[in-house]
């Protein structure tokens, strides 16, 4: 990713209530494990770090995510899989405990605009627009009726 070259201050803030609702919708049926909130470095554009929260601490995770996302140029996201308790700082697929559903990132130019033709027969449970400049980017989520044990 390229370094951030946008404004250094903004007049709006992330919506913590929407973040809480999205985390609760996605992880609400998961009873154990942890949620990873990650964020990018506005200087390099690369992943800076992760902070882990109990899978039921939606408010705390959203408060943290909103605070991090309020810094211009610093993107925040969550890992859509529940991480096994006691996992090391940097995880791999083997550290996933549950997956509440399937998801995809539409981060390439033009992908979000074409998505409707791709999912016309199977609408996603939720869509998050992750950016609009220089082009629209989105994440699509299809939630299962219950979480699936990772690797099964």
Regions found by a protein language model. Name each.
Residues 105-112:
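Short, surface-exposed ligand-recognition loops at beta-strand->loop->(often short) alpha-helix junctions
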Residues 87-94, 115-133:
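Catalytic micro-motifs at enzyme active sites that drive phosphoryl/nucleotidyl and oxygen chemistry
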Residues 1-101, 113:
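DNA replication initiation on ssDNA origins
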């Amino acid at each position: 990713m390229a370094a951030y070259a946008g404004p250094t201050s903004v007049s709006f803030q992330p919506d913590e209530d929407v973040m809480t609702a999205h985390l609760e919708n996605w992880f609400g049926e998961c009873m154990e494990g942890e949620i990873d909130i990650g964020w990018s470095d506005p200087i390099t554009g690369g992943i800076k770090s992760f902070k882990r929260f109990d899978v039921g601490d939606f408010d705390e995770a959203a408060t943290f995510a909103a605070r991090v996302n309020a810094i211009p140029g610093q993107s925040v996201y969550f890992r859509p899989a529940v991480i096994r308790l006691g996992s090391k700082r940097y995880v791999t697929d083997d550290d996933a405990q549950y997956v509440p559903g399937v998801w995809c990132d539409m981060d390439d130019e033009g992908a979000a605009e074409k998505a409707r033709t791709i999912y016309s027969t199977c609408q996603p449970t939720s869509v998050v627009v992750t950016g609009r400049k220089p082009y629209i980017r989105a994440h699509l989520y299809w939630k299962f009726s219950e979480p699936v044990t990772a690797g099964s």
